[in-house]
């Protein structure tokens, strides 16, 4: 019952705040920093081969940038696919991403910032092997209205040095 009361009270507060301001909660311009990613894209690796397709849309009253990824090729008989939820957290003033995929994988990037036409995400340390920890960094660079770069890196030494896990060039579909 307490849970119901809290949820009901929160919905009244949000509805009242929206009615008083006439704006949606995520209408602040900071929520639009990642809009350069919105659209339908083909992604290519450094070798020029197509890596996959990505559809990026805005959901939940413009609060979430939602990614739907599908690989171009089969891997062990499976077409790899995943989804991510990206949002700006006003409390921490950080961008955040949660990724889930069809092989049971997840990644969480709880720290992200917008600077120099880029969104740069960093994960919290996670167990990489039985005896080692790692950190992931993922950078989205807005190159032009029809092209962007997604660069994934990993560090095994607490962020001192980084190795590329993937490097993708996104080309907007026509």
Provide a role label for each language-model segment.
Residues 1-23:
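Bacterial Sec-dependent N-terminal signal peptides
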Residues 19-174:
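Hydrophobic small-molecule pocket/channel-lining residues, especially in calycin-type beta-barrels
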